[in-house]
A protein has these predicted regions:
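Short, acidic/small-residue loops that bind anionic groups at enzyme active sites
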Residues: 32, 94-114
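Residue-level detector of conserved catalytic or cofactor/ligand-binding positions
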Residues: 114-124
Length: 124
């Protein structure tokens, strides 16, 4: 299973905690992330992550392209509902739209990520 990770700045630590808690499950899958999020996950968990560009340099577009080419099976995108960064929000919304268009499950918070994690376990 190919899993992509993205997170608003204020949610990166939560993403790291999630990946730390489930690293034994995640280690059985191919993992992709934008640069900063991916480095944080890799540095804190030891998980091998394919690092894409940072979101401001096109990392979201790289993930969106992989979604469009059916190369991503699950997206974990932890969002900050209180963000005021319109550009950042537009990038996140575009990724959500790609997931909807190509029927790829997406988790935007911890509760929905738990459902995705359960799916990972079943698909190993």
């Amino acid at each position: 299973m190919n899993i992509a990770f993205l997170a608003h700045d204020k949610k990166k630590e939560l993403m790291v905690q999630f990946c730390t808690a489930y690293k034994n499950i995640l280690a059985k899958h191919d993992l992709y992330a934008t640069a900063t999020t991916g480095r944080l996950i890799a540095d804190n968990t030891g998980l091998p992550i394919t690092l894409l560009l940072s979101h401001k340099q096109g990392g979201h577009q790289q993930i969106n392209a992989r979604i469009a080419y059916n190369e991503i099976d699950l997206v974990l995108l932890f969002t900050d509902p209180n963000t005021t960064d319109v550009w950042d929000d537009s990038q996140m919304i575009e990724t959500i739209r790609h997931c909807d268009k190509h029927n790829v499950p997406i988790a935007t918070n911890l509760a929905s990520a738990e459902i995705g994690r359960a799916s990972c376990r079943e698909r190993v």
